[in-house]
Amino acid sequence: MAVKDQLRVDREFKKTPTGRLFFDSMTARITDLSNVRILACSVDTVRQLYRGLIRPEIMSLFDKPGTIVDFAGQRWHSGRVSKDSGYQYKLQNADLGIILLVKNFNAKLENIGPHLKIEVSPHAIDQFCPERLQERLDYYADHVLTNVERNQCAVHLALDLQGWQPPADLVARMHCRARAARDISGIKEIQWTLESATYGKGQSYLFGSAGGVQLGIYNKTEQARAIDKLDYWENVWRRRDSFDEADPDNYDTEQDVWRVELRYHHSVIQQFASGSFDLHSGETIETNSYAAFAPHLDGLWRYGLRQFKLLARPGYFEPIWTLIRDDVRVDLPVDSLVDETEYKRQYKTSRGFSGKNVELFLGNFVSLLARERVGARKAFYRLKDWECWPVIRDHYA
């Protein structure tokens, strides 16, 4: 059964697509969202991946990890990174807000492979339009690799708002296909895009898996304060303020900001690039870069809020979910193609290569585990760390 929206009305109880009053026809309950302030909806993270052959001179930058090196006309901090990242080395420039992850763990140095991922922080994304940012990323890629080609991107979309906070029963009322749901109360340690944050009160919720689509809901004020970035974010949140200091739609320094964040893995972006098509020409969009995909981010925002459904009662969306799905647009200086594109994900079928080979692999894998007396828990965690885990998971989904 398709989930429906409650009736949107104005103060005179006339139906309107922009009303902030929501009427539940079964319970006769009216929800007033007039005091909800949409502060910003932005791209919080970009990860651009590249394939190519690592230039010979690049590896010398990592001879002494932890030192400052010259690269592409700028000063960078070189170092090693954990195997969990999938890469061996990094070049980081905190002033630019850019990290280059170099040398894929699962590809040989002398071979062409997925050897580069560039991670971009919010303040760097904010400084450049998508085209200019893409030019900068491609510039760095050309200095790291030869035979370079773009290998898709990953994006995080973040909505910051005031006048709303998650209900206590959020987890129970959030419906989604994802198996993973976490309620992080405390708050404990959370891994953010470019840093680790530990802070001590509030709540944070995370739904979905890192290898697919994730929904995060958390207190952005607390998180920004914990990493000493509150001044930066308050400047961002004030951008929509009017000249009237008493305007109720202005950012309120006395009220916490909550963030609703959708995180799209690069494999999911690839599914959209292969399965989505232009309504006029019928051609698939076939993008492989952040700049090319930027006009489609409104479509991803709407898609995510239909995949993760916050319900008021069975069959009906919570009013806040309708509001942020229909009224919010991603703040980017590009023309949105959301009304000109049909968004679909093209999944690999389980017939043929991936299906047959997954089943054969798992059969042999289990036999080897039994022979070597490896416990089920240890084996499962090792399997989840493997790059082919998303293929196995999707096959049995």
Predicted segment positions?
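Structured, helix-rich domain cores that form ligand/interaction pockets
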Residues: 1-343, 356-397
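Helix-turn-helix DNA-binding segment
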Residues: 346-351
